[in-house]
């Protein structure tokens, strides 16, 4: 991607209470409070990440994501494709204010091909403020604001057609 305004994620429609209810087996996946990476690992033999973009961006590049994060001079952006048995299962976009990266959290800028969940869920001081559910046509998405040692980051995930979210019943 040459233009920093581009994203691997298409525009998503975030659901409200006025939208039809989410099917139970889909909602079970979307409201997962633990590591999505671990959950995916129950449905394949091999998970790997294809990093698409890792760089610092300014607040004006955040668009509507800015409403979910505090003001910062810059933000770490990481966009990846999560693969299960070499099939694309999920597009992930993580936005982290620079202040969240201080101290022990600076490892977040060096994850490379390590899934975000492997890092986040190995830390005792991880909390989740909320999960929003969204869609892009027939694909489901979720957005979570997480906190590491009280400092926020925003994670948006789009579940691709090959994802087990569409083919399995709840575990």
Curated annotation (Swiss-Prot):
InterPro entries documented for this protein: Chorismate--pyruvate_lyase, Chorismate_lyase_/UTRA_dom_sf
Q: What is its EC number?
A: 4.1.3.40
> Listed GO molecular functions?
chorismate lyase activity
Alphabetical keyword list: Cytoplasm, Lyase, Pyruvate, Ubiquinone biosynthesis
Biological processes annotated in GO: pyruvate biosynthetic process; ubiquinone biosynthetic process
| Localization (cell) | Cytoplasm
> Which HAMAP family does this chain map to?
UbiC (MF_01632)
Q: What is this protein called?
A: Probable chorismate pyruvate-lyase
**Species name:** Bartonella henselae (strain ATCC 49882 / DSM 28221 / CCUG 30454 / Houston 1) (Rochalimaea henselae)
This chain is encoded by the gene named: ubiC
